[in-house]
Amino acid sequence: MQDLQHVFPRLRSYILYLLALYVLGWGFTSYKAVFAGLILGTALSLYNLWNLVRKFEQFGQALDEGKKPRSIGTVVRFATAALAVVITISYPKTFHIISVVVGLMTYYVVIIIDLVVQNMRRR
């Protein structure tokens, strides 16, 4: 399996394509709150993915150097989700809460789909 450092550019581009679609949906449909929520959640999801890749790199580097590895950033991912919820609750007419949560889960779904597609290509 490829490491996250090599897969990250591909995953980032998929998420940026999704963000572009969400921006088009926000601009051309009447579902502004839903697409704004997807944009907020997916943008924070992209940050979480970048942070996860960075933490895994630091984790592996610490193991290689024989040091005690630090956490892989779970608290930061929870804090990002909490930030998204606080923003959504503060502006309920602007952001749809369920679409924010779906957006936050985007990078998990993109990773799974990418893994399945890459495994099918190798066969």
UniProtKB/Swiss-Prot annotation:
One of its GO terms (biological process) is proton transmembrane transport. It is found in: Cell membrane. The chain crosses the membrane at residues 15-35, 36-53, 72-92, 97-117. Keywords: Cell membrane, CF(0), Hydrogen ion transport, Ion transport, Membrane, Transmembrane, Transmembrane helix, Transport. One of its GO terms (cellular component) is plasma membrane. Belongs to the bacterial AtpI family. A possible function for this protein is to guide the assembly of the membrane sector of the ATPase enzyme complex. This is ATP synthase protein I. It comes from Priestia megaterium (strain ATCC 12872 / QMB1551) (Bacillus megaterium).
